């Protein structure tokens, strides 16, 4: 899509990404100026106690699989640097420069900018125990750090040199050595390679390399960055269907389609007139609007794979993406979310967000600050967009809404990026509240992206709203991989029902030839029917937030809804304690698993 736009010679330009520090009218008139000045004061204290990154902390990943402690300290430095930079930009008094310079210097003295969990040169190979300082790796957060330091230079370079002559050159030199030179001279898997599958790494890293190049690379090198970036984005786009569905889930939209938006926007600025026509492509608009279609109500989104149901509030970047592709629904969702965050959230800029990697991109902060007034003004008059039903054939996801109910059904395969073995699973909401849930994923560890991934309970089909065969014996669950997929998938014309054969997702199960699941949503609730030729016992799992109460053939999920069950041999329930910090961001300390045992036929009517 993009590379074909470069068949003719094109010119590049050094883009203007934001007003210079000298434009005091632009910076001092920002509606968030006082908020950022206050954040800077807090950041001064944080900078004095900025965490160390000793070798022992790096080694925890290799030795115990714990990646969280290193990442907490690593990201804290970068969030603090963002706050100091924004505070200095809105005040321009030099108050924050000493702490900012010290912290930027410390980041430049880190042995590596990549995470321990990403310390490998070949995709899907074991991480090396230590970084090779002579051969930098450009991973997600080396690229993020390069963009951060480059943006500090682009915004405050002259001020830093006035404070410490030569400091800006040192900072730019580290960006060149650790990010730009490796990008030009080495091949990292996320840069794209023919038909090799890509994921959110591709646009995310590409966006940040372009930010670094736009502010640190000499003008004569820009064409090389543009050409490689355009190729990489094409490699990312090839893995999306024309319907625009993100197989990684709503939570990864901000790292996938949304970083692609900024990458495309940067390409348009760096190569004027070359790529602008891409914004009119239906596929790009569909990718933009995916997040609108997955939204249930309030903070909740339909979730599959590693995605959390709390996929995060939309904000300025989504608004700008919607504006670029002419999507009023996306602009509306984003503007209303951002206005609500500004009104009620004491940390709207995510400087203290539970997800440590939030709030570390200085360009995002500038982008949001410059558009904040426009977005909040738009929110005052924007009426909520009416949600609609959608079928995403590329991934096999149905979103259906009837009355108080919203249904998410997943067909597809077990080869998604961030995959869980969840073919055929359903999630159900009533009145915007979760009824049948997808638990999501625990805090990332060494095991999460390793051959042992499916030892983690949240990845297994037995902990989704799916059947398990021979539950008291062999416990046959689904298997990972593209071959383990739904078959004979049909969707109703009204987009209120989905049917499929789940048997292929389980591989070789003795006696299993067919497992037909059908779901149908009406204004009064959900009907789910499962039929199989498997001769033995099957246990259907239902995961819920509400505590189930069994009364004969009825399962009540608190006061939210009840399931009338036909065909059950027995029904058992268990409490599932939730202690993991990542899961606790979305769920209370206890979830519930209902197991409905049956043979060959089962019917549920939930309402």
Enumerate the language-model features and the residues they cover.
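Active-site lining segments of carbohydrate-active enzymes
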Residues: 128-251, 262, 373-383
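CBM-like, beta-strand-rich accessory domains located in the C-terminal region of large
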Residues: 119-122, 143, 342-356, 446-607
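Cytochrome P450 core scaffold surrounding the K-helix E-X-X-R motif
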Residues: 436-448
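Carbohydrate-active enzyme catalytic cores, enriched for enzymes
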Residues: 258, 262-435, 492-493, 587, ...
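Extreme N-terminal leader/anchor segments
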Residues: 1-37, 83-89
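Non-membrane alpha-helical segments in proteins
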Residues: 76-90, 102-106, 143-151
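Long, well-ordered core segments of solenoidal/helical folds
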Residues: 43-54, 100-118, 166-191, 224-244, ...
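Solvent-exposed loop and edge beta-strand segments that line ligand/cofactor-binding
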Residues: 64-77, 126-143, 185-203, 241-257, ...
């Amino acid at each position: 899509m993009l590379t074909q736009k470069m068949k003719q010679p094109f010119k590049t330009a050094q883009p203007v990404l934001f007003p210079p520090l000298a434009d005091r009218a632009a910076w001092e008139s920002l509606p968030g100026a006082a908020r950022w000045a206050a954040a800077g004061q807090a950041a001064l204290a944080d900078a004095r106690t900025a965490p160390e990154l000793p070798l022992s902390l790096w080694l925890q990943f290799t030795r115990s699989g714990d990646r969280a402690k290193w990442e907490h300290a690593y990201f804290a430095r970068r969030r603090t640097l963002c706050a100091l930079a924004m505070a200095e930009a809105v005040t321009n008094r030099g108050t924050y420069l000493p702490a900012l310079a010290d912290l930027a210097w410390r980041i430049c003295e880190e042995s590596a900018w990549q995470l321990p969990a990403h310390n490998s040169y070949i995709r899907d190979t074991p991480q090396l125990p230590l970084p090779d300082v002579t051969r930098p790796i450009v991973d997600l957060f080396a690229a993020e750090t390069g963009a951060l330091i480059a943006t500090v230079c682009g915004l405050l370079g002259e001020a830093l040199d006035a404070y410490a002559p030569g400091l800006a050159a040192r900072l730019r030199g580290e960006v060149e050595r650790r990010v730009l030179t490796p990008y030009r001279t080495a091949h990292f898997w996320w840069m794209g390679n023919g038909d090799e599958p890509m994921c959110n790494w591709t646009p995310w890293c590409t966006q940040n390399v372009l930010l670094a190049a736009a502010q640190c690379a000499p003008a004569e090198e820009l064409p090389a960055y543009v050409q490689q970036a355009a190729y990489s984005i094409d490699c990312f786009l090839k893995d999306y269907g024309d319907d625009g569905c993100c197989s990684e889930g709503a939570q990864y939209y901000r790292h996938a389609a949304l970083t692609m938006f900024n990458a495309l926007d940067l390409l348009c600025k760096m190569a004027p007139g070359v790529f602008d026509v891409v914004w009119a492509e239906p596929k790009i608009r569909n990718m933009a609007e995916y997040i609108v279609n997955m939204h249930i109500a309030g903070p909740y989104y339909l979730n599959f794979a590693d995605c959390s149901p709390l996929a995060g509030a939309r904000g300025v970047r989504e608004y700008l993406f919607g504006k670029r592709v002419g999507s009023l629904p996306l602009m509306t969702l984003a503007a209303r979310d951002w206005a609500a965050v500004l009104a009620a959230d004491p940390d709207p800029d995510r400087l203290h967000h539970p997800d440590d990697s939030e709030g570390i991109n200085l360009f995002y902060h500038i982008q949001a600050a410059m558009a904040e007034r426009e977005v909040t003004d738009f929110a005052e008059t924007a009426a909520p967009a009416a949600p609609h039903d959608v079928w995403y054939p590329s991934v096999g996801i149905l979103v259906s809404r009837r009355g108080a109910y919203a249904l998410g059904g997943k067909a597809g395969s077990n080869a998604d990026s961030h995959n869980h073995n969840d073919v055929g699973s359903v999630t159900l909401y009533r009145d915007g509240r979760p009824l049948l849930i997808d638990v999501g994923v625990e805090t990332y560890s060494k095991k999460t992206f390793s051959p042992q991934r499916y030892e983690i309970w949240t990845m297994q089909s037995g902990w989704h709203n799916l059947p398990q065969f021979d539950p008291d014996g062999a416990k046959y669950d689904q298997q990972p991989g593209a071959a383990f997929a739904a078959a004979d998938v049909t969707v109703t014309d009204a987009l209120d029902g989905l049917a499929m054969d789940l048997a292929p997702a389980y591989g070789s199960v003795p006696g299993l030839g067919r497992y037909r699941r059908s779901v149908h949503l009406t204004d009064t609730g959900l009907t789910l029917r499962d039929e199989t030729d498997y001769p033995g016992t099957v246990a259907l799992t239902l995961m819920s937030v509400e505590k189930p109460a069994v009364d004969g053939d009825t399962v009540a999920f608190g006061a939210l809804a009840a399931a009338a069950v036909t065909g059950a041999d027995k029904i058992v329930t268990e409490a599932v304690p939730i202690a993991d910090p990542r899961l606790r961001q979305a769920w209370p300390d206890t979830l519930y698993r209902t197991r409905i045992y049956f043979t060959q036929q089962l019917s549920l009517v939930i309402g």
